[in-house]
Amino acid sequence: MSPSALVLDFGGPVLLTPFELVAHEPGTPAHGLLHLRGPLATAEQPDPVWEDVQAGRITERAYWAARAEQWHESGGREPDIRSMIAHLYEPPRPELVREQARALVRDARAAGHPVGILTNDLRAFHSEEWIEKIEIVGDVDVVVDGSVEGHLKPAPRLYELLSERLGVCYADMVFLDDQTTNIRGAEELGIPSVWFDVGDPDTSYAEVRKLLGLPPEVPRG
């Protein structure tokens, strides 16, 4: 029996989220809009629009388009998603990628597991030059990007494309994503899935390792 494939959403499980990056930018328009919002929102500072994303009432793309417009109105540059994302993610640098994700990909590949990235927005949010300099993208076997394919998670066709290109059936994948709508879409197809908790990444990675039969991560240092 072939090892199960590891399938990672990119933004969140692999790449730090904008909500985390703005913690280092107090006093900026981006900090005012995104700090303690999204998956890091609290009862004292809720983010009802993010809750709409999780419930499937609006798309994540619509969420970021609205935030980019607000960012512009608050003193940011152009009112488009790419400009706001570039403000946070340029230049491309190693610390944008979670160390736990690096370790998971490294260990999965060493154990013979195929590894894929299944994303909605990689090329919608980032330039080709930026993508080429984020080395983990080149460490996986397959990248399926909804912004290129014309289908966005949770549309079944995107998962189908991933299955075809990895050469594995749905039951032989383990999928990690931070959007509950995408998890539901995967589970409806029979894909074993783990919701990525931005507030508790270690627990999410540990659950994926368990499903893949990988040992717990050994901290470096």
Q: Can you say where each PLM-predicted feature lies in the sequence?
A:
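N-terminal helical cap/lid subdomain that shapes the substrate entry/recognition surface
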Residues: 2-103, 110
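Asp-based, Mg2+/Mn2+-dependent phosphohydrolase catalytic module
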Residues: 1-10, 118, 122-123, 127-221
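Short alpha-helical linear motifs
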Residues: 88, 108, 198-201
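Short, charged low-complexity intrinsically disordered segments located at boundaries
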Residues: 54, 96-103, 116-120, 137, ...
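Anion (oxyanion) recognition and catalysis
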Residues: 109-110, 187
